[in-house]
Structure formats: structure tokens, C-alpha cells
């Protein structure tokens, strides 16, 4: 008797505003209206988010952890505790390229790592979307519901979403990713790049992964405007220097929805 295939994951197309205003009571999957190659997982709780994505986070970008193999349950629990975190606090939002997710699941299979049901559900979603094929340019991001934790206020949720969407654009738009890389090399000084690395290392990112550094640079310096998460002094930078970098970034940025976001910030600043 043939085995029945898993039911298709339902995905709704939504704008940034619609996603931000959504109040999930269970996991909801959105396709971002301005860039359909970005999928958004909207979780009702940080626990639910962590169970699905913390092992991927450890594999892709967390400092002090291996990026060439997948952690077992025991190793992941120990790594989370060693950093003084819990399943809920390990990450507030997640972002991954299709290629990184494909590599994670391929290694988990080759190493015979027992994955949680939530991780298996994620695998099914990615298979449904065709993300395990070679050369797919796409990005998966996540965020938790407002009120799911005292830190996740309405404004914090909006900031997390904007930050993670910029990562989604980086992963799904090779032209934008190349622009960010060139900007990192040519517009920031060596000292500024070092200061950004130091800031990101303090946040738990693996500063040895260069692409991670310039991807986070664009997300924090250009699109994270909530002082709860980033202020220029965190990267040893003045407000004036950051404003100069933001203006230069906008000037050469590829056309599209994310450029419009940065332009709106600049217009609002000029109007004040």
C-alpha cells in the first residue's frame, strides 16, 4: 500500500505590515509579498520557534560551535545552557539561506542525527518549496508573537521583522548580496569592520564567518533602528558617521522594496 504524502503546508502571501500586525495562535507561514523568495515563519511562542530552529542556528552561525556537523540533542542542550540561555532565549529571530538549510539537513541525515518533529516539519516545508535543489536563492526568516515574552513588545516585533526581512533579501537577491559585500570592503574602514566584528561577537555570532559579518552589518547598521537592539556606539561609531554610511549605502543600493525602506528612513530624518 503506498504511503500517503504529508499534507501541503498552507502559505499566505502578506506585506510587511500585514505580517507585523498578525497575532499568531499557532505557527503561520507567510510568503513575503514584496519578494516571494522570502518565507516568514510567525511563531506563537519563543519555545516553539526555538525547538524548530535553534539547532540550525548553532550549525550556521553561533560562536564556539561546530559548523561542519549537526549537534545532537544533548550537545545542543549543553551549548544553550553554557551560554546562560534557554530554548526560548537562544535567539529572538532567525534567518537562513536555502543553501544553509539544505546543508543542515543533508549532514543531519549523513550523521544519523535524530531530529525533532518540528525540524522534520521544517524539512517537509522546504521540500515542498523545492529549496533542496542546487542553486536556489531564497531565505527563511522567523519571528515570535508580540507578548510571547516580556521583551517582545509590539515595537520589538516590528524591529525583529524588519531586521530579518533584510536578511531574507540578502539570501534571495544575489545582486543585493554582492552590493553589501563590496560596501563592506570599500566603504567601511578596517577599524570599522573590526568594531562591527567585535559587536557581533559579543552578540554571539561567529566572527570568523566573513559573509555572516557583512550580512549582519547591513541588517544592524542600515535597518535596525530600535535602540533596544542597536545603537551606533555598540559598534564604536558616532551617529554622524553611521548617518553618512547609511546615505552612501542608499545612494548605490539596487532598486527594490528594501531600497524604498531605507529611503523612507532618510526622508523621515530630513523631515525632522
What label would you give each PLM region?
Residues 1-102, 255-272:
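N-terminal low-structure segments adjacent to metalloprotease catalytic domains
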Residues 9-12, 17, 21, 152, ...:
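Short, solvent-exposed segments of well-ordered alpha helices
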Residues 23, 39, 49, 169, ...:
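Short catalytic/ligand-binding loop motif for oxyanion handling, primarily in non-cytosolic enzymes
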Residues 24, 28, 33-36, 41, ...:
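Metalloprotease/metallohydrolase-associated module, dominated by Zn2+-dependent proteases
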Residues 45, 144-147, 166, 174, ...:
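Short, flexible loop/turn elements at secondary-structure junctions
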Residues 80-162:
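Active-site scaffold of zinc-dependent metalloenzymes
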Residues 159-172:
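Active-site recognition of the HExxH zinc-binding catalytic motif
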Residues 174-187:
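Short acidic alpha-helical/loop segments enriched in Asp/Glu that coordinate divalent cations
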